[in-house]
């Protein structure tokens, strides 16, 4: 068992990036507002996005290159499109996840209630971990975080389920009001994660191969599938927590990070019992810390690679981009810290409406001449991919048409 865990890496980094805002904030809100009514959206998003995430490690294993190299081979304009989309979203995404993490740190540690101070502390901690240890430390840290998160979340769901007196209601709901539709799109945008994480996944796969040269293709794909299944299970768990504890409670979530965190944990402890405080607080904080550090690592890696491919060597530097991202995040944080909900909504909706681009680019690349034939997807995965592209494109067009 220990040997199996040691082989895991990029899949758990994927889980770490995926299970933050999409699970803790969006899945919990979905459960609180709709009960289990949006379970269909969670399952469909995970199903139809699966091939495009899978193509990340598959392409890297086939070619020894990242998907960004593949984008450049498809067309320089594909890579430039990625760069523009990434620059638009990465600061907002990093700020959104840091706000939630800082709010939860206030509840868990209680040293100071100043959310700006906690944001600075968290970003500084993440910077130190990444600049000192880079991939190796992040890889090892994530194994601990994911195990802790999974155990504490499953325990919290079990306690909530045994203490709940209401019957399980699984009627599925399709929102009709404009606000509810916007939430649905935001929910699906980051469920289980934005599709650009497939690029991060391909880079992490290459890093894992450097660290462990003997790791096989089968082990890498197994690692990815473990991470993916973990995100699905935990997504359902957080919907269950929101439904069992908060549904029909009469509470309205605040858009302020610290207040949201307080409401989240207090509602749990009031309903489940004060003894559950540590379980919920640890599960919530480790979820968001894992997302924060993973995002802070991945975006600079992709910027370095992208600018290298474009021939702009002077700014193709990991340390340069991680500092830019940290400073940009804290700057946005100071000006928008009272609008956590708005930031999360903007970040998640942007992720959804850009998903068709990543889906089409990844599908085209994995089936192109740039991928050896023996590594190209099976007919079944290709059928699922086409259905996924149709699903994501139709939903995006429909949403944009009703704005």
List each model region and its residues:
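Flexible loop linkers connecting adjacent transmembrane helices
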Residues: 27-29, 54-77, 105, 109, ...
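Transmembrane-helix boundary/entry motifs in multi-pass membrane transporters
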Residues: 2, 35, 62-88, 108-115, ...
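Selective recognition of specific alpha-helical transmembrane segments in multi-pass small-molecule
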Residues: 42-55, 219-247
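Transmembrane alpha-helical segments of multi-pass small-molecule transport proteins
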Residues: 11, 83, 108-131, 147-158, ...
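Membrane-interface loop-to-helix entry segments
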Residues: 130-162, 175-178, 347-355, 380-388
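Hydrophobic transmembrane alpha-helices that form the core helical bundles
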Residues: 62, 79-110, 288-306, 340-342, ...
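Hydrophobic alpha-helical segments and their helix-loop junctions in multi-pass secondary transporters
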Residues: 147-174, 184-203, 359-371, 395-403
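Extracellular loop-to-transmembrane helix junctions
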Residues: 29-54, 69-73, 77-80, 182
